[in-house]
Every structure is written in structure tokens, then in C-alpha cells.
Amino acid sequence: MKNMKNTVSILLFLFVFLSACSDDSIPEKLKPEPPQPDVEEPNPDDDSENCGNNQNSVLPALSVVGRYLKNEKGEIINLHGFTQTYSPFFNNNAWNNYDVQGCLNYNKSMVDGILAAGWKFNFVRMHLDPYWSDDPAMQSVRYEGHERFSEFRFRKYLDELFVPMAEYFMSKGMYVVMRPPGVCPNEAPYQGIELGDSYQQFLLKVWNIVSQHPKLKNNTGVMFELANEPVKIKGTDGTYGSTGDGHFQNLQLYFQAIVDKIRANSRNIIWVPGLSYQSSYAGYAKYRIQGENIGFAVHCYPGWYGSDAEEDVAKG
């Protein structure tokens, strides 16, 4: 998978709560009452389950403030790192098939080697690779598609592979940005994504599972990137595209539903894709993603913009 740099853009909402005191008169005579123990009354709007950090957290909490990530001291934190995927094909066939321990051993050794060489990374983009969650008995429909997704296999290897690998990264001081299995539909038999389609249902299921996981929920070292490029959506006019007002209008609705699903479970930082190869975001200025601790997962490929050329190639 290609490396990218994440750029943050988010609105924070501050809520001011006003309270009032009653002006009821005091009765002339009060009967003494026995002392009552202090009992905390239940609050129907209590969100205590989502308050406080996961006890498995080992990294300082970060939050999205304007266009920056900041720590609890208000200092700007820049993340720089790499991406890692877990198919043997992309890892020199270093292990056989579904050998979990072989996969862990190899990828941990890669991390150790990178750090030993002196690279100062503090985050990794972790692909929850569909190699593990696909049902191999089903026919493949497209490259890294969602059609063969097995919830049983996903839960199994989330526990056995992805969470242990994430814990290893965090033990090395690296934040983990998880992305879902595979890529958005972008080739036959699809023209792209659309509101209410099977891919949106797939993402809702994946993130509902991940955001409720006891070792990931509210873990200060874990963030969620909702989907992976390329992103082409059916707009309000019925056409599929990656630009224009109508496409952004539906894109906001598409990803807002997933944001809301995650927020019902956890407070982890969320990274929202844009259109095209996650390079188009202007429409979000009008059709805003609502919520806190949300940024944009902007993908930028320097080579495409001519950084590898001896002369200006006028790309971009």
C-alpha cells in the first residue's frame, strides 16, 4: 500500500451549560429527618462508559484542535511513520498462510529493525488486511473486496493478530491508525459507492466491532481511518463522481453514519476520507462532518506531483 501523510482539519464544539436555582419558599417548621447516605443519582444522559481512557492505554492522549493534533499540555504533535499490511504476498511470503505466530514474528522483527536503524517513527497505519477476514471458500469478486468478509474470521484475527500487533507498536511508543479491510468499490461490477449500499453496511459492521473491542475502545494510542481510496460516490443527481456539490453532499451522509456508529461506542480519534484518491476535501467546508476529535485522512503522493523529476512536469 502507498504511504501517505495525514493532515488534520476539524471543528470543535464547546458547549456551555446553564443552570438555574429555584426560589421556593422554606416551610416555617421542618421535621428533623434521619441522615441519609450519599447516593449518586443515575443520570439518564450519563456517558461514563465512554469517559476516561482505556486501562490498556500506554501512550499520552491526543486530541484534534483545529488543524493540529495536540497533547494534554497543548503542544502540537506531528505523527510520522509508515504503513503495514499483513498478507504474505506483500511480505516476501515470510510465513505460510494463516500462521498467526509466523506473521507476528516477522512483522515485529521488521519494526525492531526499523527502530534499530535509527528511524524515529511515532505512528503506523495498520491495515486490517482482508487476507485474514475473507472466507477463502467464497469466490473473489474484486481486488481486496468486501464480498467475502467473514465476521467470525474478522473477530478471531482481530483478537489473535491485529490487537497483539497494535499493542506491540504502542509498547514502542507508536500510535496506531487502523484502516478497514480492503478498498472502496471502484471497478466492475460497481461504479463506486452509494448511500445504503453493501459497502456502507460492511463498514458499519467492521467499525462497530472494532470500536467496542475492550482493548481498543478509548485506547489513547489507537485511531480509526474509516475507509481507503479510491472514493467515487453516487451523487444527488444520480451520477457517480469524485467532485462536485452533489457528490460531497452524499459523501457527508455516507461517512457521518459511520462516525455516529463509532461515537456511540468510543471516543477514539477518527480520520475521514475525502473523494478520489483521498485528495479532494473542499466540499466538506459546506457539508461538514459533525462531532469531536475528527480529522481528515488526506493522501498525498509526492512522486505524482513531480518530486522525482529533474524538471517541472506540471502535475497536480
Predicted features along the sequence, with ranges:
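Sec-dependent signal peptide recognition
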Residues: 5-12
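Bacterial Sec-dependent N-terminal signal peptides
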Residues: 16-53
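Short acidic, Pro/Gly- and aromatic-enriched capping/linker segments at domain boundaries
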Residues: 52-68
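Extracellular glycoside hydrolase catalytic/binding regions
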Residues: 59-62, 86, 90-106, 191-223, ...
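Mature N-terminal segment immediately following signal peptide/propeptide cleavage
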Residues: 63-83
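Structural recognition of the beta-strand scaffold that forms the well-ordered cores
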Residues: 76-84, 122-128, 175-179, 222-226, ...
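Feature marks short, surface-exposed loop/turn motifs that line or immediately flank catalytic pockets
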Residues: 85-88, 127-134, 184-186, 230, ...
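Aromatic-lined substrate-binding rim segments of carbohydrate-active enzymes
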Residues: 96-185, 200-204, 251-266
